Amino acid sequence: MTILADLRTRTRGWHPPSRYAGAAYGVVAVLCVAALIVDHRTLEGAPIWAKPLKFAISGSLYFLTWSWLVSLLPRFRRTAGRLTNALVVIFTAEYVLLVFQAARGRASHFNNATPMDATIYQVMAKMIIGLWVATFALTVLVMFTKVTDRASFWAVRAGAVLSLVGISLGILMTSPTAQQLAQWKTGGTPDMVGAHTVGLADGGPGLPILGWSTVAGDLRIPHFVGMHALQVLPLLAIALLALTSRFPRLRDDVVRARLVLVGAAGYAGLIALVTWQSLRAQSIVHPDGLTLSAAAALVAAVGLASWAVVRAPARVAA
């Protein structure tokens, strides 16, 4: 059996529309890479096609994960399928507007420069609300997923909840900055309303492709980290299961479940840490002593908790 045929067999029971959407956005991501190569225009210091590329990759991961999660539901699968269909439609409509603005060399988010730009951003903002509502409903339904492995049981639930938290953190970027408020007070109209950079204006030096500021805080970081808990925690459960042949202690599904819960708590701490760091106008690549101390404490807490779980006495069969 070829790899492609094996993949088709494994994913046959997944929710079809979101599965196809995930695959389609993977192809779109490749096209965005090609666009980056041939179109060297920049916007606010970043390649014009970097944002469509990031959204395509995130969309692919997001829809493939939800396609799998919907297949795990013993009840409400039809409702979850309809909600996931709505996610595909809304996200695709938003993505079309994002690409349209990129092709024009215009910012898609926070753009208030012209009536057309403002209208596009307002429409996208309403779409984001729709995405959040549908994701919230799906997160509630995920609590009914049927998974026999306890580690996966908790990974799916914790991942969905933390992902919703990460999506919600995007609201922090929509508030006007001090400079924008000052411009309003003097009778002006700012071209941009909202920002992802904290402490400086958007458009400064940033990490390649990701674009995260290297000189100030960046609210895209907690948004990204939180949103992808949906993939990280299930992958943790899968990794622990794969290690059972090498580490006999992990053959106990209770041990793996507890390690997943420790990982989920640590991941929640990471989301809080990078949110706090960003709001303090501190770059991800230049943490101060306070941030490093908090990070060290988080790592130590996760490490000690994991050690305690593994070292706890094994269950004795009745």
Residue ranges of each PLM-predicted region?
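Extracellular/periplasmic helix-loop-helix junctions in multi-pass membrane proteins
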Residues: R246-V254, W276-L292
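Membrane-interfacial catalytic/cofactor-binding modules of polytopic membrane enzymes
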Residues: A178-A229
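Short, Lys/Arg-rich, polar N-terminal cytosolic tail immediately upstream
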Residues: M1-W14
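Hydrophobic cores of alpha-helical transmembrane segments in multi-pass integral membrane proteins
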Residues: P17-I37, W49-S71, N85-A103, V123-L138, ...
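Interfacial segments of alpha-helical transmembrane regions
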Residues: T79-L87, F144-S168, A182, V255-G263
